[in-house]
């Protein structure tokens, strides 16, 4: 397995598909990286030479934020919104959907498991 950006990418898949295993790289960015490195997108990772792998690593490290750096940036952005108490920050604090989704009947995943409301107890005669 080739190791790029501290991620083991699968050998038996096409290069474009393998690059998407790296957090922060989707299909479009993976294709863009292949074009910059002048490597065929259909080439399998196990067919790449050491020079091509080094070239891919250099392009990814120098031009893109991936893995730990990207995760840290996203976390800091969310923390900043929470600190300034903007609307999105308040939604994060309350663990509700942030981008305007309905919550009356949906958003179970974000809100957590449904809590049963205790029924009224019958009066004893």
UniProtKB/Swiss-Prot annotation:
SUPFAM superfamilies: S13-like H2TH domain. InterPro entries: Rbsml_uS13_C (IPR027437), Ribosomal_uS13 (IPR001892), Ribosomal_uS13-like_H2TH (IPR010979), Ribosomal_uS13_bac-type (IPR019980), Ribosomal_uS13_CS (IPR018269). Gene3D superfamilies: 1.10.8.50, 30s ribosomal protein s13, domain 2. The keyword Nucleotide-binding does not apply. Located at the top of the head of the 30S subunit, it contacts several helices of the 16S rRNA. In the 70S ribosome it contacts the 23S rRNA (bridge B1a) and protein L5 of the 50S subunit (bridge B1b), connecting the 2 subunits; these bridges are implicated in subunit movement. Contacts the tRNAs in the A and P-sites. Belongs to the universal ribosomal protein uS13 family. Part of the 30S ribosomal subunit. Forms a loose heterodimer with protein S19. Forms two bridges to the 50S subunit in the 70S ribosome. This is Small ribosomal subunit protein uS13. It comes from Rickettsia africae (strain ESF-5). The gene is rpsM.
């Amino acid at each position: 397995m080739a190791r790029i950006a501290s991620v083991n990418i699968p050998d038996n898949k096409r290069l474009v598909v393998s690059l998407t295993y790296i957090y922060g790289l989707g299909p479009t960015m993976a294709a863009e990286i292949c074009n910059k490195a002048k490597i065929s997108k259909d080439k399998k990772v196990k067919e790449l030479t050491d020079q091509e792998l080094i070239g891919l690593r250099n392009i990814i490290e120098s031009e893109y934020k991936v893995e730990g750096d990207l995760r840290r940036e996203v976390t800091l952005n969310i923390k900043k919104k929470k600190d300034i108490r903007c609307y999105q920050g308040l939604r994060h604090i309350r663990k509700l959907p942030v981008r305007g989704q309905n919550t009356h009947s949906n958003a179970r995943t974000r809100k957590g498991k449904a809590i049963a409301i205790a029924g009224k107890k019958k009066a004893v005669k």
